[in-house]
């Protein structure tokens, strides 16, 4: 946020203000010009006003005074000419004929960076101490006095918002002004005494041999105006805001001039500020204008005409403003207003109000000038509405709520990563990965295609700070070459918390698998299977839904743990699933299932199976053989140990049988259960225990 200092007496030179300094400060604040401070200096009051970036017109005394005129319903003296005590005005000599001192030449090599440049040659100047009133005025706004010539340029800067610069003309080689790009290796000592090495591309003001100023930022010491100066070249120009901003950042110098150029100066103000400064120098410093040069003239943008309906504005603001009052407010702010029909105007914004583009902007102008504090308080009308939620958003919400309910903690990581993080995670960087053109750091220059590297980094951070037990997840976007999808990544490690009649125990892969199955069941996803890849890779299982791969689940390898600096011996279980893939098959409709009116009966099955037989195949066969009677199926235990041959697993599966129409007898259940056992032995070659 930038601040603009202006004195109460300076405002009164433009506007006949009747309010006290304190009350005027309150009115300015209520009109959007927040007064940060008000202090009395040498018998005058000085306001320090916050200036928003889209209001460069407030960076001038005239701009502030114009606002004061609007909010106090007072005339703005735009054509005011300062009378300088004890100084007899001299007529400006506009001679342009060939004379010995008429040797100024101006050329612009980069017209895009400098679309308009004025140079006035003023001779016979006597640079001396400024009069007391000028020194006092500059001091009140935080500027120190240098000499009368420089002080006049600073005064016009603060009054018009147009930066000016005075060169000692006799120190310009060949009497030339050339606006060009710097050449690599050129150097310039600035007015602050600091030497800068100029990089190629920096916009400079140069004479025939060397740079004499950095355009729009600061002049050079070699051509500054001193007490020995007799002839000056007065500069007023318009520079491209982006060029000035880049230049100021490159050399590390920000000045009052560069700040205004960065926010774009008013084109008509370029000449207005120049003429005012020229007249004052001729009046106060004994100078004579002998030649005025101009290079370029930017095309004026087409003035945008805005149709403004006062009735609509009044309805929005809930205030009573007459057509005459509204037009007067806009006119005092510099707008051109034409009547079209009753309470409808055609409004044209002035050149210094580039922020006004639509009717709502004009409504704001009227509200500010009317006074925000005068707008009555009203109770807003509350209308019932329903917010549409997409299926992807609903699945994301359900997944997040379920994982939190199961004890997982959500983490949020950066969406940017690096090749190093992929390598540490043993993940190959996919071809076509999106990379930033101008990254702030090489550690964060790739758009992630997986959540796992960031989760691994999070695990490393926590484990190495004595937090070995964690259950974390992240739901976030990942980025393919041409599309953006949503994934959920989960990490699980350490000991499972103690439960009723159960002690702590280490987490297993099946805890994570169970969490995923709970998620799939909550989303009513059908047709999912966990398949062990052949040959076995880093992932223990790949997750397929209707034949399409949707994710993976596995154990972090020791090599990956070492690369991430993870020193715990316990396994870290990892999973990543595409929620976008789940969204294509999920069913979020809630279906009411009535409470069974008949009792159910549970039976357990214990079998020996090889590692190559997936549980999904066993489950599918049981559901097929017990169709119509099976109410629930759950894997109660998976055991590998002394009593189980190597390469095999002992599974205990709990089955719940029941009927919606009658109570099943033992004979009926035994028949169905025997059919299931027969299928497990004959079709899957399992061994019953």
Question: Model features per residue range: what roles?
Answer:
Residues 2-372, 376-392, 397:
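RNA/tRNA-interacting regions in translation and RNA-turnover enzymes
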Residues 5-8, 22-26, 331-335, 355, ...:
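A carboxyl-terminal module marker
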Residues 11, 277, 313, 490, ...:
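Residue-level signal for inorganic ion chemistry
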Residues 30, 46, 63, 67, ...:
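Extended, well-folded interaction surfaces typified by the phenylalanyl-tRNA synthetase beta subunit core
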Residues 34-38, 75, 283-296, 338, ...:
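Short beta-strand elements
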Residues 46, 437, 468-503, 545, ...:
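Polyanion/phosphate-binding surface patch
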Residues 74, 80-81, 100, 208-245, ...:
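Conserved alpha/beta core surface patches that mediate binding of polyanionic ligands
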Residues 260-276, 489, 495-498, 502-523:
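A conserved active-site cap/scaffold subdomain adjacent to cofactor or substrate pockets
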């Amino acid at each position: 946020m930038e601040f603009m200092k202006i004195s109460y007496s300076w405002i009164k030179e433009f506007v006949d203000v009747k309010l006290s300094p304190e009350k005027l400060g309150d009115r300015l604040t209520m009109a959007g010009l927040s007064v940060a401070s008000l202090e009395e200096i040498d018998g005058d009051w000085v306001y320090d006003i916050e200036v928003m970036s889209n209001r460069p017109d407030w960076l001038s005394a005239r701009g502030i005074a114009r606002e004061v005129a609007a909010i106090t319903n007072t005339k703005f003296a735009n054509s005011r000419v300062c009378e300088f005590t004890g100084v007899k005005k001299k007529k400006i000599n506009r001679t342009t004929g060939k004379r010995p001192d008429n040797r100024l030449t101006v050329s612009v090599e980069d017209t895009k960076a400098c679309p308009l440049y004025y140079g006035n040659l003023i001779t016979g100047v006597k640079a001396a101490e400024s009069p007391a009133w000028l020194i006092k005025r500059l001091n009140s706004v935080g500027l120190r006095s240098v000499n009368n010539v420089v002080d006049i340029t600073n005064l016009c800067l603060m009054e018009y918002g147009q930066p000016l610069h005075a060169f000692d003309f006799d120190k310009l080689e060949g009497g030339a002004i050339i606006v060009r790009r710097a050449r690599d290796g050129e150097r310039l000592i600035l007015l602050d005494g600091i030497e800068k090495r100029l990089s190629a591309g920096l916009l400079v003001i140069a004479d025939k041999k060397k740079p004499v100023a950095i355009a729009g930022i600061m002049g050079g010491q070699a051509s500054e105006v001193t007490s020995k100066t007799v002839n000056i070249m007065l500069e007023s120009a318009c520079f491209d805001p982006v060029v000035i901003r880049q230049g100021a950042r490159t050399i590390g110098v920000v000045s009052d001039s560069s700040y205004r150029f960065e926010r774009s100066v008013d084109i008509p103000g370029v000449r207005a500020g120049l003429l005012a400064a020229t007249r004052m120098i001729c009046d106060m410093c004994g100078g004579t204008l002998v030649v005025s040069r101009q290079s370029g003239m930017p095309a004026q943008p087409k003035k945008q005409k805005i149709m403004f309906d006062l009735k609509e504005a009044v309805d929005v603001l809930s205030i009573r403003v007459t057509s005459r009052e509204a037009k007067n407010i806009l006119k005092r702010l510099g707008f051109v207003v034409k009547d079209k029909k009753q309470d409808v105007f055609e409004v044209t914004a002035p050149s210094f109000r580039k922020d006004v583009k639509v009717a709502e902007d004009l409504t704001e102008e009227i509200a500010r000038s009317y006074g925000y504090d005068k707008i009555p308080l009203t109770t807003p009308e509350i209308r019932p509405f329903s917010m549409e939620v997409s299926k992807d958003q609903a699945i994301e919400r359900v997944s997040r709520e379920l994982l939190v309910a199961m004890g997982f903690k959500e983490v949020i990581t950066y969406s940017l990563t690096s090749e190093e993080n992929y390598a540490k995670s043993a993940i190959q960087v996919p071809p076509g990965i999106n990379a930033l053109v101008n990254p702030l750091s090489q550690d964060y220059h790739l758009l992630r295609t997986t959540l796992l590297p960031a989760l691994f980094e999070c695990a490393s951070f926590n484990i190495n700070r004595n937090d070995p037990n964690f259950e974390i997840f992240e739901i976030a976007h990942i980025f393919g070459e041409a599309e953006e999808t949503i994934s959920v990544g989960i990490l699980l490690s350490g000991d499972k918390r103690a439960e009723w009649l159960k002690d702590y125990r280490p987490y297993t892969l099946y805890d994570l698998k169970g969490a995923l199955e709970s998620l799939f069941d909550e989303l009513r996803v059908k047709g999912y299977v966990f398949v062990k890849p052949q040959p076995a890779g880093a992932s223990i299982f790949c997750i397929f839904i209707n034949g399409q791969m949707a994710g993976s689940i596995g154990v972090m390898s020791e090599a990956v743990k070492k690369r991430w600096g993870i020193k715990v011996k316990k396994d870290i279980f990892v999973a990543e699933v595409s929620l976008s893939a789940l969204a294509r098959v999920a069913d979020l409709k809630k279906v009411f299932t009535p409470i069974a009116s008949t009792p159910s009966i549970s039976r357990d099955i214990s079998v020996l199976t090889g590692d190559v037989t997936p549980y999904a195949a066993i489950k599918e066969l049981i559901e097929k053989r017990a169709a119509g009677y099976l109410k629930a199926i759950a894997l109660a235990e998976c055991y590998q140990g002394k009593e189980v041959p190597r390469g095999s697993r002992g599974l205990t599966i709990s089955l719940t049988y029941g009927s919606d129409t009658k109570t099943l007898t033992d004979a009926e259940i035994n028949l169905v259960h025997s059919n299931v056992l027969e299928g497990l032995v004959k079709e899957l070659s399992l061994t019953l225990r």
